[in-house]
Each structure stands twice: as structure tokens, then as C-alpha cells.
Regions:
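Extended helical scaffolds that flank P-loop GTPase cores
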Residues: 5, 50, 234-308
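Conserved G1/Walker A P-loop phosphate-binding module
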Residues: 10-13, 32-128
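Residue-level signature of catalytic and energy-coupling elements of molecular machines
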Residues: 73, 85-86, 104, 120-122, ...
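Helical mechanochemical/support elements of P-loop NTPase systems and associated helical scaffolds
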Residues: 100-104, 119, 131, 135-138, ...
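Conserved nucleotide-binding/hydrolysis micro-motifs of P-loop NTPases
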Residues: 101, 125-126, 157-161, 183-188, ...
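Conserved C-terminal guanine-recognition region of P-loop GTPase G domains, centered on the G4
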Residues: 114, 140-206
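Canonical P-loop GTPase G-domain recognition
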Residues: 187-239
């Protein structure tokens, strides 16, 4: 089975939902450049509905958490400011341990917003969820089996194409996603702005611009996380139909077999896709029967927390 070409999926997603809507030049928008424009080209867009004065509702808990209402996964490529976002929300403190059975460090903390407590799990920085490294495997397994209430994907506003590859893969696993469009300060220094509203429309999930190092946009970020976690914002990701009829049938049949062998396993369709794509680790986990135990272990870790 041929490997899924994620860059092809990405290019398709970058085409606007209204494919006949003309750009300034009169042609249909088809590329990443439709999201990025110079500061002079960007139209002013005041937003009366944007959350303001929310800082007073945010309480940084660090690791002082005996229980929580929601689990939030923080995912992203390396060097996108993910740890800066984590530290800004949790109060510059991390609870560091190891992932179960792994040597990779795990950091988690928490914050309280509007009387609700959020546990934030900082996943290893990774470019993909296709599980070719231990970091990718950890991030993938947590998103597949940890059942986070919300997944925040931190992306670099200056390198959207590279970063949105991971975001697209996350959207294949879960609907409850918020895109944190970070490093907006650097984008401005380069004379660039990102049309986050259009990006949100085309992805089907909220997009929040931030500059975490300067605490810009974090109030809106926690507000949006809260809205998604409580169901006040319903995410409807625009997934690309990139599977052929034959592949769809194979995925459907294999998904049914997986669900029969591992009752209650979340995201069985993604597992089927990885098996068809030749994922050796996933295949071994299915053949040995370890997949069910892995799912239980990851879900338990999400609820209990990292070891001290």
C-alpha cells in the first residue's frame, strides 16, 4: 500500500472552501500565499466579539493540582514556542517525569480559568505523527488513546506549510483542536500578517494568533480552549477526501476487525490507516495483542499524571 502523501493533502486543504472566490488578481486562490500577505495588504478587521479583559480569570497553578476538569494536550513542531506557551499558562513551572516505559521527559502543569481547572500536557515536539521516532510515537499514542478534551497545536506563523502538516494529522485523530498561531511578533518584523480568520474557516477549527514570549493573545487562547472544552464552540474540521474507493473499503473492513479484536479502542480508523501504510510498530502491537494494553496505559497516564 502506498504511503499517504501528506504534502498532497496539505496542498488540497490550502484551496479555499469557496473555490471560485477570486483573489485580488482575479484568479482562484490555490496556495499558502493566500494566507500570508504584507502588512500593507492586510485589511483592518476590528472584532467586537473577541474576548477581552480575560486575564483576571486566569490563575496559573503550576503543579498544584489535585484534580482537574479538562485535559489539554499541547502539540507542535520543535522550535515553535510550545514550551513558552506551556510556561506562560502554567506559571513557569513544570512537573517533569518520564512517559510510562519511556526515557523521554514528560512535562505537565495546570491553570484555572473561570472556575474550571485545566491540566496541560506538553507533548514532545515532533514534525509528524507517523511514528518513526520515539517522540513521534509518544505524541501519537497520547492523542490516539489519552483522550484529551482539547488538543492545542502550536504553529509558527512564519512557517505555516511545514507546521500545518502536523496539524492536518492531528485533525485526522480528533475534532477538538485549537490552532495556536504563535510567533506573530516575528512575522510582523518580517512585514507579514496571517489571515487567521480565513485559515480557521478553511481548517474548520479555531485559530488564535499569539506571541507567547510577550504574553500576547494568551487570554484569547485560554478563552477559546474553554469554549471548545465545554462545547460552546463546535469544531468541524474540513478533512480532505484523499482515499480512493478501494482504499476506503480496505480501511472500513480493517477498522471493523480492529474494533472486534480491541473493543472500545479509540481512533480505530487511524490505527487501520497506519497498518495499511506499513507502520511496523503499530503492526507489532496489533499482532502481539499489546495495542489494547497500550491504549489502557496511555489513557490511565492521561488521567493520573506523570510520575514524580
Amino acid at each position: 500500500m502506498a504511503e499517504i502523501q501528506w504534502h498532497t493533502v496539505f496542498e488540497a486543504l490550502l484551496s479555499p472552501c469557496e473555490t471560485n472566490r477570486p483573489t485580488k488578481s482575479g484568479s482562484s486562490a490555490q496556495s499558502l500565499h493566500d494566507y500570508i500577505m504584507t502588512s500593507k495588504e492586510l485589511p483592518s478587521s476590528g472584532c467586537d466579539d473577541c474576548p477581552v479583559h480575560l486575564a483576571g480569570n486566569l490563575f496559573k497553578l503550576g503543579v498544584d493540582m489535585k484534580d482537574w476538569d479538562f485535559v489539554v494536550a499541547l502539540a507542535g513542531n520543535p522550535n515553535v514556542g510550545k514550551s513558552t506557551v506551556f510556561n506562560a499558562l502554567t506559571g513557569l513551572r513544570q512537573h517533569t517525569g518520564n512517559w510510562p516505559g519511556k526515557t523521554v521527559a514528560r512535562a505537565e502543569g495546570g491553570y484555572e480559568f473561570r472556575d474550571k481547572r485545566f491540566k496541560l500536557v506538553d507533548l514532545p515536539g515532533t514534525y509528524s505523527l507517523l511514528s518513526t521516532t520515539e517522540d513521534e510515537e509518544i505524541a501519537r499514542d497520547f492523542l490516539l488513546f489519552g483522550r484529551p478534551d482539547v488538543t492545542v497545536v502550536v504553529v509558527d506563523a512564519n512557517r505555516l506549510e511545514r507546521n500545518l502538516n502536523l496539524a492536518l494529522q492531528v485533525l485526522e485523530i480528533t475534532d477538538r483542536v485549537v490552532i495556536c498561531l504563535n510567533l506573530m511578533d516575528e512575522a510582523r518584523r518580517h512585514g507579514l500578517e496571517v489571515d487567521e480568520r480565513r485559515l480557521a474557516r478553511d481548517l474548520g477549527v479555531p485559530v488564535v494568533p499569539t506571541s507567547a514570549r510577550y504574553d500576547e493573545g494568551l487570554e484569547e487562547l485560554v478563552h477559546t480552549i474553554d469554549q471548545v472544552a465545554t462545547g460552546k464552540i463546535e469544531c468541524k474540521p474540513h478533512r480532505i477526501e484523499y482515499l480512493s474507493r478501494g482504499l476506503k473499503e480496505a480501511v472500513s473492513e480493517l477498522t471493523s476487525d480492529i474494533e472486534e479484536q480491541f473493543p472500545g479502542l479509540p481512533n480505530s480508523r487511524w490505527v487501520a490507516l497506519r497498518l495499511l501504510d506499513g507502520d511496523t510498530r503499530m503492526r507489532n502491537a496489533v499482532q502481539s495483542g499489546e495495542l489494547g494494553e497500550l491504549a489502557r496505559q496511555v489513557e490511565s497516564g492521561a488521567q493520573v499524571g506523570a510520575a514524580a
